[in-house]
């Protein structure tokens, strides 16, 4: 098989630790019973009976759309205008006052992949937290890109100093930065940056952007599972303070929000 693939990529077998732990959880359930084992690897919403939740409001609405309407092509490769407008309103509401564009993608991972492929050239470096979804690193590897990791935590707080230091080193080497933040509800820790942490983060990015273009990718896959839905998007008001050499890409996914994991419906909101 390797004879048919790219030569200049990492051909190491992909080992997903989540699936291996999930398999161990399933085996433990057989031995100890489901009441004695908590499988915390499931990235999906399940009910108290252990069944996958498919929100009735979502799928009743989806099923009411005529088949021909669902089957036909979108009006443009970047998605239908009504979809793109709906995504922007859902993601940003009235919090962001910046010029923006929305690109439809195959799930939130499609938005992440698009950014990694389009922002960085081969051989350049992606900045990631040391605790993160493993597919970020995989996507970089498939584009022949490197990764540098910042320490996500300083005690029980976001480690801004490590983030800035890592980004500065990358900026000095390649003249631009693409850094990923998975917030709110970071996977796998569940951590959400505070309002003050976001203010300091944007201020630091603005300073770094004086040396070259800075792109921040905010993966919001779990945003609608935040503790307070009324305020969980308030941090986005800080986006209004970005400098002219800063771009923010918000990776939106309907998978978690609308319990539509297999629908592969997402978007990149570019600010």
Regions found by a protein language model. Give the residues of each.
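N-terminal small-domain helix-loop-helix segment of the aminotransferase-like
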Residues: 2, 11-107
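Catalytic-core helical/loop segments in enzymes performing group transfer/polymerization on anionic/lipid-linked
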Residues: 3-5, 165, 238, 266
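Short, well-ordered beta-to-alpha junction loops that form the rim of enzyme active sites
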Residues: 42-43, 184, 220-221
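Hydrophobic pocket-lining residues within nucleotide cofactor-binding pockets
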Residues: 45, 152, 254
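Short catalytic/ligand-binding loop motif for oxyanion handling, primarily in non-cytosolic enzymes
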Residues: 46-51, 187-190, 224-226, 258-261
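Conserved core of the PLP fold type I
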Residues: 66-212, 223-243, 249
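Generic enzyme active-site microenvironment
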Residues: 217
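Active-site PLP attachment segment
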Residues: 236-271
């Amino acid at each position: 098989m390797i004879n048919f693939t790219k030569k200049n990529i990492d051909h190491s077998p992909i080992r997903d630790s989540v699936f291996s732990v999930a398999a161990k959880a399933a085996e433990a359930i057989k031995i100890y019973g489901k009441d004695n084992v908590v499988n915390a690897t499931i990235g999906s919403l399940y009910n108290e009976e252990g069944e996958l939740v498919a929100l009735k409001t979502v799928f009743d609405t989806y099923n009411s759309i005529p088949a021909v309407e669902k089957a036909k092509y979108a009006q443009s490769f970047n998605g239908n205008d009504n979809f793109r407008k709906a995504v922007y309103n859902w993601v940003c509401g009235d919090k962001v006052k910046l010029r923006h564009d929305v690109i439809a993608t195959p799930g939130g991972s499609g938005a992440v992949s698009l950014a990694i492929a389009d922002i960085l050239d081969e051989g350049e470096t992606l900045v990631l937290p040391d605790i993160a979804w493993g597919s970020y690193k995989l996507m970089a590897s498939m584009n022949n890109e490197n990764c540098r990791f910042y320490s996500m935590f300083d005690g029980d707080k976001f480690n801004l100093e490590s983030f800035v230091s890592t980004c500065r080193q990358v900026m000095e080497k390649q003249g631009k930065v693409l850094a990923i933040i998975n917030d709110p509800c970071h996977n796998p820790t569940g951590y959400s940056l505070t309002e003050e942490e976001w203010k300091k983060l944007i201020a630091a990015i603005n300073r770094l952007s004086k040396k070259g273009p800075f792109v921040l990718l905010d993966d919001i896959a779990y945003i609608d599972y935040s503790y307070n839905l009324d305020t969980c998007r308030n941090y986005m008001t800080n986006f209004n303070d970005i400098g002219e050499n800063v771009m923010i890409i918000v990776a939106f996914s309907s998978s978690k929000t609308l319990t539509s994991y297999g629908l592969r419906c997402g978007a990149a909101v570019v600010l």
